[in-house]
């Protein structure tokens, strides 16, 4: 018997699978988009619906942890009602280095196809056609069943650093390598290497192309 998410079935710590695409926000009262979750993704309820008794207002947000990338955000509860199915357990799938490498060609093909679609840069975008930089990279790998962290600085910490000679950079980089930009304190941008030093990325209006470009 399928159990759908409602106020009656709301239990902290319970696990659910999405039946819709949904936006994830920075906090319970912020409209800043930080991620998006697509149909089929799983999440855990980690905080209850909040009520603002002073203003007699119910805050329509629930705090969740997305299981595939361990990312925490807030969903609009009204969008979740009857749109998430209860699951009893969830396990991550482990990939060997060889298995990941074997999927790089299809990951690159997916990214190039995303570039051909009409798109623009969207902070917090991970579903498409509009992405932010790390959302594009995460979604590219997820298209082949490989989940990596959500944000660029998290992806940098997750990956293995490679020492490169700047003069032969294009020769040493391999297709599928991630390129990180920013300061020594924190990475602020990421791109996906294609070949010969060229990389594909989604960049904003101020410092980029307002969308996906090579």
Give the label of every model feature segment.
Residues 1-2, 61-97:
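Short, structured interface segments
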Residues 13, 40, 173-176:
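Loop/turn positions that initiate beta-strands
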Residues 127-144, 148-151:
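Active-site nucleophilic cysteine motif
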Residues 149-214:
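...with weaker cross-activation on analogous glycine-rich loops/strands in unrelated enzymes
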Residues 3, 8, 13-22, 26, ...:
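Aromatic- and glycine-rich peptidoglycan recognition patches
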Residues 33-78:
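SH3/SH3-like beta-barrel superfamily modules
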Residues 106-131, 150:
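Active-site nucleophile-His-acid catalytic modules used for acyl/amide transfer and hydrolysis
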Residues 17-28, 154-164:
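Short, structured beta-strand/loop micro-motifs enriched in basic residues and often containing a Trp
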């Amino acid at each position: 018997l399928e159990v759908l998410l409602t106020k009656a079935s709301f239990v902290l710590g319970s696990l659910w699978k999405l039946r819709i695409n949904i936006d994830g926000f920075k906090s319970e009262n912020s409209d800043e988009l930080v991620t998006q979750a697509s149909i089929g993704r799983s999440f855990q309820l980690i905080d209850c619906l909040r009520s603002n008794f002073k203003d007699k207002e119910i805050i329509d947000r629930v705090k969740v942890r997305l299981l595939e990338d361990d990312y925490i955000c807030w969903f609009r509860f009204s969008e979740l009602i009857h749109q998430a199915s209860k699951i009893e357990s969830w396990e991550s799938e482990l990939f060997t280095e060889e298995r990941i490498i074997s999927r790089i060609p299809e990951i690159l093909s997916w990214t190039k196809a995303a570039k051909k679609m009409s798109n623009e840069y969207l902070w917090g975008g991970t579903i498409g056609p509009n992405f932010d930089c790390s959302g594009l990279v995460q979604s590219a790998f997820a298209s082949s069943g490989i989940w990596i962290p959500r944000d660029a600085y998290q992806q940098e910490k997750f990956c293995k650093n490679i020492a490169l000679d700047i003069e032969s950079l294009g020769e040493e980089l391999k297709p599928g390598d991630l390129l990180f930009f920013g300061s020594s304190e924190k990475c602020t941008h990421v791109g996906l290497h294609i070949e010969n030093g060229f990389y594909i990325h989604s960049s904003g209006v101020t410092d980029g192309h307002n969308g996906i470009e090579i």
